[in-house]
């Protein structure tokens, strides 16, 4: 699956500014994906190849920030 990483504590996307290194680490090492980067226009970490449960979903959005 591909999409924005989910912050499991807040229910929001994992936010970033320009830090591809952190997003890559979270995606590759912590979430089972193969490529992660900071999507600048959305200010959120995008991950390719992660499990569906690791990704933020608009329909099940629980972000209250």
Swiss-Prot record:
**Pfam families listed in its UniProt record:** Toxin_3 (PF00537)
Extract the InterPro entries matched here: LCN-type_CS_alpha_beta_dom, Scorpion_toxin-like, Scorpion_toxin-like_sf, Scorpion_toxinL/defensin
Keyword flag Secreted: yes
GO terms of molecular function = sodium channel inhibitor activity; toxin activity
> Which Gene Ontology CC terms are recorded?
extracellular region
Location(s), subcellular: Secreted
Keywords assigned = Disulfide bond, Ion channel impairing toxin, Neurotoxin, Secreted, Toxin, Voltage-gated sodium channel impairing toxin
Where does it mainly reside? secreted
Query: Which stretches make up the LCN-type CS-alpha/beta domain?
Result: 1-64
Q: Does the keyword Thylakoid apply?
A: no
Q: In which tissues is it expressed?
A: Expressed by the venom gland.
From the UniProt record, list the coiled-coil ranges: none
PROSITE patterns hit by this protein: LCN_CSAB
For this chain, the annotated S-S bridges are 12-63, 16-38, 23-45, 27-47
Q: Which domain of life is it from?
A: Eukaryota
Q: Which GO terms describe its biological process?
A: defense response
Q: Which family does it belong to?
A: Belongs to the long (4 C-C) scorpion toxin superfamily. Sodium channel inhibitor family.
This chain's function reads: Has a toxic effect on insects and mammals and is capable of competing with anti-insect scorpion toxins for binding to the sodium channel (Nav) of insects. It also modulates the binding of alpha-type and beta-type anti-mammal scorpion toxins to the mammal sodium channel. It may act on both site 3 and site 4 of voltage-gated sodium channels.
UniProt free text on domains: Has the structural arrangement of an alpha-helix connected to antiparallel beta-sheets by disulfide bonds (CS-alpha/beta).
Please identify the protein, giving its name as recorded: Toxin AaHIT4
Q: Which organism is it from?
A: Androctonus australis
């Amino acid at each position: 699956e591909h999409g924005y990483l989910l912050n499991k504590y807040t229910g929001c996307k994992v936010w970033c500014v320009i830090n591809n290194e952190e997003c890559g680490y979270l995606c590759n090492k912590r979430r089972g994906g193969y490529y992660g980067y900071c999507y600048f226009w959305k200010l959120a970490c995008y991950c390719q190849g992660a499990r569906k449960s690791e990704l933020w979903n608009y329909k099940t959005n629980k972000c209250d920030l």
